[in-house]
Amino acid sequence: MILKRTSLSRRKVLRGAGATLALPLLEAMQIKSFSKTNAYVKPPVRAGFFYIPNGVVQTAWHPKDTGEGYKLSPTLEPIKPIKNDVTLLTKLDRIKVAGTDGHAQAGACWLSSASPDELSPAGYPLKKTIDQIMAEHTGKVTAFRSLELSCNPYEDNRESVYFDNISWYGHGHVARSLRDPKALFNRLFGVKQHIESGSVLDLVMDDAKSLNHSLGSTDKGKLDEYMHSVRTVEQQIERVTKRQEDINRLKISSPVKPWQAMTRDEFIQVMGDLMILAFRTDLTRVATIMSSPERWGSPLKVHGLFDKPVDHHGMTHGQGNQHVRSKLESLDHFHIQQFTSLVMKMKNIKEGEGTLLDNMMFTLGSGISDGSLHIYTDLPTLIAGGAGGAIKPGRHIKSEKGTPIANLWLSMINAMGVKIDQLGDSTGKLKLS
């Protein structure tokens, strides 16, 4: 029996005067054949990396047990609603190379494919990072090879590029992070500056209505939900821009930029929302997002936690004080809350026969385990998602002491379809499924 269905290209976009809106994966895009078997195209695997600087308070991070039934530690308590979707990995190390700043090396080399003896002219064990190895493979079929995002509003250049970037094309070639949400939105959706005051949805509405007439009921619902999510992000950016304009009316000597008027939780969520939009529309399959830079005295203001800017790095060196350590634990807890919020959004997006999260590897981690001691052993690492079946989540995997984190990176690279057997100082692959 031949079924008559509308078939759409995965690259179908909505167009308007001055804007282009990519679409999420619809059922009409998945139909591989119109036979009675109704074979569908499998959604692609995506990889996202969520960086937290300056390590974590070790005593509050580590659970005492392993496996599927492990009990969450105080810091990890926010992942409770997504525990079955997250893999906790412990005892993964990087070898620290002497001669460079501990924080700069932690951030810049976190995802590095270099072994400890492969040093750049600047003295860092730094080569192409694993996100860029993945992007070389996946970027051939997406609009953007990769996205590099930062939630750092600070623009003081006292610190070098190594503190504020985790993605590198190779020695001396940084993939610089975007930190302006509005500029990122316009880049993703092709919004021209002279008409960016309106909604991108208004610009493509005629094309959207035309498409809607040809869709089935399920796809109509998906399209409506997606358009709503795009508008929600637009409104977030509009609110922050309005707040910036109000502040600038006070005639402060240095005008405030939109992202500098955000609390850090707002910043992380709006950048994370844009990353998720890029993933679900297949504009990219690889992205990195830094919650803050390494070491910088970046003003960190968190709604309901820190009403005045605090110095995260400075606090890590005061952990001997119980009051300071308590604040640090609250900050670690905050980062896990932000991660969980983004993961929940991915889990709520239907894709194929599952969800976007089922096809994700969303990794939270830091290149330094203890910010006060500057050590790289037992790095904090979480992975949300199932990577299209390559990962069996819901477990605490405790590796043998001295296991290089490169073993994890190698397994993740393979899950993205890149066939290599060695990466940096890897000694094998981690079994994640």
PLM region spans:
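Ligand-binding pockets and gating/stacking loops
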Residues: 1-433
